[in-house]
Amino acid sequence: MKRPSRITPLEIAIGASILGSLLAVAIPSFARNVHATHFAEATDGLARLGTQAVAHADAHKDVGFPKSAPLTPAEVPRGARAVDPPGTWDHPTWTALGFRASPEGIPHAFSFAFDGAGSSFTARARGDLDGDGVLSTFETRGVVGAGAASLTPGMYVEAELE
């Protein structure tokens, strides 16, 4: 008669060590990917903002880019997404650009600023994804040259995983 097979303590130890090794590799990668999805909000927002700014400058050649708008919302969300109170995005520049961080009532993790000077602009997104008080910064720029507005290639990024 054959004895039913049992899992020995050695086999359990081997299985646990393999599982532990897999988790040691997978969990940090997963955490980085989760953070990366959050900073997509900043890059997508700046892409929309840059496109709107270039369209505004091309449509208003006598004015160029709109005037500056302060960091909006003024208090950068810290470690959690925030929903803006009504009126947060009513600044004339945000209205001229048709821009807000997210649709009304949808939480977001970044604040945005626009520094316009007629023939050039810098758009900035600032956030604190982990809530430690250290802000990440994303910037894109644009210029009016040779009669047409355009975005400067590349994006400045500082501490993107903060």
Where are these regions (language model features)?
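Low-complexity, S/T/G/P-rich flexible repeat/linker segments used as non-globular hinges
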Residues: 135-162
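N-terminal single-pass transmembrane signal-anchor helix
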Residues: 1-34
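Internal catalytic or translocation cores that form aromatic/hydrophobic pockets or channels
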Residues: 52, 106-108
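Short, glycine/small-hydrophobic-rich surface segments
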Residues: 43-48, 53-101
